[in-house]
Amino acid sequence: MYRILLPVDDDEDRARAQAAFVAGLPAADSDISVVVTHTLTSAEADAPEELRNVERVDTVKLVRDALDERGITVELAEARHPPAEGILDIAAEFEVDHVAMGSRQRSPAGKAIFGSVAQQVILKADVPVTVVGPTPD
């Protein structure tokens, strides 16, 4: 079975695009399993355990439900901070074959100043990484 990691943030449009990417792959409902992960913010990570459950994140629920409807096996995992390192750790832990990152529209200057989680994952991942853009309206 081909295992894909979907690291989602809090943006529902990006999460929908990531779910649509996976659902559109050949044999998605029979030969693909997905690990959905979310990196909790510092404040969320410091919250009591029952409040920092990744299943409470709206975009995680959205992706899980969308893929469940298509018959795609979904596992959930909580990534640690900083996001890129947490994503890479989850990729290694679950031995994924592919990572499908959501894309944020940011200027080149913004990327240079703030960095890009997707860029860090692309450069450091041991598996192929696809950057999924927003779905057309």
Q: Over which residues does each language-model region extend?
A:
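Local beta-strand N-terminus motif with an aromatic residue
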Residues: 1-2, 31, 95-97, 118
